């Protein structure tokens, strides 16, 4: 089976596309598919001609488009059936939502990485599946916490919270974590029982291996986002058994299940004036941090990822079943 993956050209990535697109393609190859890529550069409509040329040369059985705008390019060619995956960015802007979801009605099948993305789409595909992106388990190498800290030069006596993004990414909502940590550190009852300092570390400009090592070294992975698709970094933190705290968004509740070492915070809705936390959310975050930082152990998150069939290998098999249903 020949699959042509279509996505937007990204200048700041080694393969010029988002890592999970490349990794999904590699997993499909490992499962027996022949995979090639087409990257949309510039205008989405003007890219249709180049895509048709690529299709005639490669002769794929399926064109698989990632993200709604790339799907516009894919769905305007009429040579090969299209599968479209929505990753969440399509729902954040109403113009993009309208155009992406409208064009997705032309696709043979739509994959939403989480149910809420379909719920938020203006036009909802009838032929669809909920299939999150998978985790490259072979890269999720577990290093003992003490050893990981030695490699990073982290203080063994401090509490480290790994923030799931860059501090300046408003959607990731670092102000909530920052303010909660400061409030916790100022709490005399906490200081009485915890003499160690708390350090927040951002995930910015890091390789996959560098991120994984920090997940192994951290006491807690924090993702207080306002919006996510099916958060990859969170799944990766779980895959190395790092305790996690996240807002109740996307598929977080389903990911955590009833496993210990995972904490869920209600989603503090942003207003036009403020993206940071209201007092209720802040107090809740402080209480959850207090509990999470006292946990000190590791989780069974890796086993949870496997049970939920969220490894790249497992996800590839589910996607191939979608392809087969179209070709047959």
Predicted regions and their residues:
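Short hydrophobic beta-strand element within catalytic cores of glycosyltransferases
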Residues: 243-246, 253
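Short His-centered aromatic/hydrophobic patch
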Residues: 65-70, 86
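Short alpha-helical donor nucleotide-sugar binding micro-motif in glycosyltransferases
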Residues: 104, 213-218
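Acidic anion/phosphate-binding donor-loop and adjacent secondary structure
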Residues: 122, 135-151
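Conserved donor-binding/catalytic core segment of Leloir-type glycosyltransferases
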Residues: 154-172, 178-181
């Amino acid at each position: 089976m020949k699959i042509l993956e279509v996505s937007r050209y990204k200048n700041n990535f080694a393969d010029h596309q988002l890592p999970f697109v490349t990794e999904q393609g590699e997993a499909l190859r490992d499962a027996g598919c022949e995979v090639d890529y087409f990257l949309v550069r510039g205008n989405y409509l003007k890219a249709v001609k180049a895509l048709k040329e690529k299709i005639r040369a490669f002769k794929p059985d399926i064109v698989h488009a990632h993200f709604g705008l790339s799907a516009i390019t894919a769905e305007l060619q009429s040579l090969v059936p299209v599968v479209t995956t929505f990753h969440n960015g399509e729902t954040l802007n109403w113009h993009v939502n309208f155009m992406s979801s409208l064009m997705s009605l032309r696709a043979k099948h739509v994959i939403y990485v989480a149910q809420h993305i379909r719920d938020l789409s203006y036009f909802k595909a009838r032929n669809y599946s909920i299939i999150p992106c998978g985790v490259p388990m072979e890269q999720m190498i577990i290093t003992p916490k003490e050893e990981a800290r030695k490699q990073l030069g982290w203080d063994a006596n401090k509490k480290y919270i790994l923030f799931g993004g860059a501090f300046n990414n408003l959607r990731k909502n670092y102000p909530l974590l920052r303010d909660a940590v400061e409030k916790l550190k100022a709490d005399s009852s906490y200081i009485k029982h915890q003499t160690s300092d708390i350090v927040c570390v951002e995930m910015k400009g890091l390789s996959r291996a560098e991120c994984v090592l920090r997940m192994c070294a951290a006491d807690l992975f924090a993702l207080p986002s306002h919006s996510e698709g099916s958060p990859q970094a969170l799944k990766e933190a779980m895959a190395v058994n790092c305790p996690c705290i996240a807002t109740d968004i996307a598929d977080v509740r389903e990911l955590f299940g009833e496993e210990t070492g995972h904490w869920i915070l209600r989603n503090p809705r942003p207003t036009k004036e403020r993206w940071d936390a209201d007092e209720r959310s802040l107090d809740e975050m402080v209480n959850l941090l207090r509990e999470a930082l006292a946990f000190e152990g590791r989780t069974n998150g890796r086993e949870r990822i496997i049970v939920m069939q969220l490894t790249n290998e497992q996800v590839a098999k589910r996607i191939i079943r979608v392809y087969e249903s179209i070709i047959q």
